[in-house]
Amino acid sequence: MKKFLDLGLQPLANKYLTRKDLRKKRKEQFYHLEVGFDNKTKLVSILNKVPSQKMFDNSYPYRSSMSKTMQKSFKELAKHIKLKMRPKKILEIGSNDGSFLKNFKKSMSIGIEPCANVEKITKKQNFNTIAKYWDTKLAKNILKKHGNFDLIYSANTISHIKDLNDVFKSIDLVLSKNGTFILEDPSLIECLKRNTYDQFYNEHIYVFSYLSLSNILKKFNLEIYKIENLDIHGGSNRYFIKRMDNKIKIEKSVIKQKKEETKYGLNKKNTYFKFTKRVQESKQKLISIFKYCKSKNKKIIGYGATAKSTTILNYCNINDQTIDYFLDTTKDKQNKYTPGTKIKINQYKGGIKEDVDYVFLGAWNFKKEIFKKEKKYIKAGGKFIIHTPYPKII
């Protein structure tokens, strides 16, 4: 694995600080965030991997139900699954608060969610969920109790698991002979095109391309037969995966994706060093925008204290001296402080205040949804600061 990007020391992206933490001057854990490329497998990965138990525990704050965009995406996919695939049993790996599972009968679905605080939400709604990490031991227990599954779904989860061989070995155990595994994760080619280096943080161990994922799947006699390109999370791919002996035809979308990635150079290390140069330029430009705004005594706040924004803030050294506070709709983040940079997170109560001159868009991947919500602020002349595809004020 050849290192191509160094994002410096980074705190755990979802470990938000409390007032008590600040008062007692609790020492945060920082990890050197470096990203590498494996020329043999074409896999892109962070190099210093943090143990899962430190990241996904009883304080995990992310809720997929907080985004209308995510809710809509889950609903549309569920509709397609019901009409075209008609599975009898569904397993979701990384079920979070049940935003996908709620579209199916509880009797036919099982969710895996290791964060007990989030898993409790689905348990209260009588979903069949298991608060454990996905591995072969759990897969064997599920197989023994529930048998095989016609459909396995996982969104923004597989890239969080260190041992990919164990992940796909476990999938192989529980996927039925003619079943489909749908894997949804950020797209590497879109990450490079849009210069979204904040796709890299402690939890995002991998950012997949078709080229890298297909190489891994071969080991387990699995292959991708269809790919959907999504705009979610700043550009994602939805991979439809089957067993190699399943006679479903491989669709044109797979050939198209392979050609696009090869043409862009995702199979060449030089492509990643060029990306690094753009990231460094992006950092300097973003810092200069903030300096300019502060020199004019302008008030800047943040919108969406996301895990992604943790990478940007710490890499660019943007703290509470620059951003007054963040607004966020997630209850478990409110009245806390951003990891590393200690910016206060306030509850979003419906609309940006008139005295705010600039808003740094931490949740840039939901830009359309946010701009629609903040029409009044924009109409009154309010401005946003974004970093992708390059830093600018809009």
Question: Which residue stretches match the model-derived regions?
Answer:
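A conserved beta-strand element that flanks and buttresses the S-adenosyl-L-methionine
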Residues: 153
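Conserved SAM-binding loop of SAM-dependent methyltransferases across substrates and taxa
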Residues: 97-107
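Conserved class I S-adenosyl-L-methionine
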Residues: 86-96, 300-303
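Short, glycine-/aromatic-enriched active-site segment of Class I SAM-dependent methyltransferases
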Residues: 183-206, 210-213
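N-terminal juxtadomain amphipathic helix
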Residues: 1-68, 228
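Flexible, glycine-/basic-rich loop-and-beta segments that form/coincide
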Residues: 234-278
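A short glycine-rich, Lys/Arg-flanked "PGG" loop and its adjoining helix->strand segment in the class I
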Residues: 165-180, 374-379
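Conserved beta-strand signature within the Rossmann-like core of class I S-adenosyl-L-methionine
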Residues: 178-186, 382-390
